[in-house]
Amino acid sequence: MDENIKQRFDLTGKVAVVTGASKGIGEAIARGLGEFGATVVVSSRRLEAVESVAEQLCASGIQASALAAHMGDMEQARALVDAVVARHGGLDIIVNNAATNPVFGPMMNADESVFQKIMAVNVQGPLELCKRAVPVMRSRGGGSIVNIASVGGLNPERMLGLYSVSKSALISLTKVMAKEWGGMGIRANAICPGLIKTKFSQALWQNEQVLKQALAMAPISRIGMPQDLAGLAVFLASDAAAYCTGGVFVADGGLTV
């Protein structure tokens, strides 16, 4: 080979934005991208939360900054792209990690507004953000979109029905992005995490029965950590995954095998 494979993982000169990056999976992915050379913009609804993350990343030698955006507000989703470009001159990598799930229980107990909120944050926001970014990415020779879905999008969870529906939609959206934008050099892939130890999923892993069942079913019998997803996200964001688009990558310890 005429190229060192390590060079394909190098993200130096790339600009990345990670939504839902104030903690958990988003924060871990932002750190991973930064450690491989990317300039990282961390975003969430509350500016002070991601400012703290950006400060920690900068203290580690990573080029990072913070921007606030509510992914359930389409104007804010689009404005986030504009702000990143204004600040850094371009955008190459998008990680759509922001998500919401305000209900835990049967679909019958959820009203229309709850479903609309879930779909807005988990599906429509990522779409509008990416649509805004396409011309920017195209002008820079392409880019990479990594959508954080869920194994619930592949095998719906009974008590997380509407959330599972939204993640199924995000997986399908990822494939449409890959088909429509591949000719412009823009790749799109989805990561489907299993049970990860984050604040977002604490209602599950703090439930002794749920945790015991998950650990018994998974070949890798431990709960996942946010850092377990960072390497996969870096791979998909980098040229090491240059031939990967429309893919659905499961990281669940083998739970769904």
Q: What are these language model-derived features?
A:
Residues 15, 22-23:
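Conserved glycine-rich cofactor-binding loop
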Residues 47, 68-80, 112, 228:
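The beta1-alpha1 cofactor-binding region of Rossmann-like NAD(H)/NADP(H)-dependent oxidoreductases
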Residues 127, 222-251, 256:
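C-terminal substrate-recognition "lid" of short-chain dehydrogenase/reductases
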Residues 150:
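Residue(s) in the substrate-gating loop at a strand-loop-helix junction
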